[in-house]
Amino acid sequence: MKKRLTLTFWGMLVAFSVMAEAVKVTSPDGEYEFTVSDDGQLSYSLFYQQKEVIEPSRLGIEWNENWYDGIRIVTSRNSRIDKNWKPVYGERAVVKELYNACEIELAKTGSRKRMVLDVRAYNEGVAFRYRFVGGEYLKIENEFTQFTLPKGTLAWHTERAQTPYNLLPLEGWENESDRPLMLQLPEGQYACLAEAQVVDYVRTKFKLSDEKPYTLLTSMYGIVEDIAPYHTPWRIVMCASRPGDILANNDLLLNLNPDCKIADTSWIKPGKVMREVTLTTEGGKALVDFAVKRRLQYIHFDAGWYGFEYDKSSDATTVTLDPRRNEQIDALNLQEVISYAKSKGIGVILYVNQRALQQQLDEILPLYKSWGIAGIKFGFVQVGSQIWTRWMHEAVKKCAQHGLMVDIHDECRPTGFSRTYPNLM
């Protein structure tokens, strides 16, 4: 009996030491070292080229329960991916996808639930996300992900997509900063905080912590609701000695999205486009001739071709000119222009405001395909909430089913979805 008790006690000590040990994930080239710890609270840190670029920072999420305090690492499983893939278009003919991965299973004191922290370390940067298994209802009310930067770090702050950038210290911000956020570190390095695969989540921005200096908090636009299995977007940290190198490594966002879901992509052809402003048949044909001469690939009819874009009664299945833009309501024979453009090797893109998209999307897609247009420009899409984020990405999928490319107007920031659905230009 005494021997059994001794062995049992020793086994408990071994198990405890394994669970309490920090989990480290390094990039294939060894430049990045990402460490996750559960010393009372779940936290992480990140070294790049042996310099600490993210100091110990909080991890956690509030979903049905507060998963911040009392979190412990249960198990971890490592893997490695090394492959190449060919994008439909882009800066490279072949994209390298090489990373070390770790699935870290987490438990909470007093709870039978489990959560997984997925970590990937690439040579271009490190990414992590929260993942939920099982089939239960999820209500995510807060994401506790923090980024504590070295003292003296400066940030290229911008409130939203169409506001100026200002180089600011990590203190005294008047408002939140949009993502991605470029940082100038005190020892001459640069870092970028970005995100990928934001397809069924809310918009998040950065705000300064009132309690911890030089710390950025994740600010959610609203709550997220779904049914597990489910995962949050990837949170990304990219580092470099020069800011241009971070831009050159932007394939990382694509690599953090699933493979292409479109079997035949031959119809997806990027190119230069010019807007037709007269909304007339003559103007459309003249612009086609100009496009041929100037080696452009597309012409574009913007707001007004189907009526006043902000009037919900405007019908995007008809060519009904907005008198604010052209008083001669029968001035545009759209089908004639499309046929003429096609004979010249030029594609036609049509603008549709979200008001009409929301009401008529399933009706207009097969119709536009029959008209022979090349794509749609989504106008003034709403961004921020989970509902509208999901709607937009589902709309891109539907366009792919009808062989239509998509250009999105307004404050939508792409997060790599064009790898999965490359009809999103």
Which residues does each predicted region cover?
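N-terminal signal peptide c-region/cleavage motif recognized by signal peptidases
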Residues: A15-S17
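A generic structural motif
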Residues: G134-E136, T280, Q382
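Aromatic- and carboxylate-enriched substrate-binding clefts and catalytic-loop regions
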Residues: A303-M425
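Bacterial N-terminal signal peptides that target proteins for export
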Residues: M1-F9
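An acidic-aromatic substrate-binding cleft motif
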Residues: Y230-Y298, D302
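N-terminal accessory beta-strand-rich subdomains and adjacent acidic, glycine-rich linkers
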Residues: A22-D259
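Short, flexible loop/turn elements at secondary-structure junctions
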Residues: K108-G110, A121-N123, K151, A240, ...
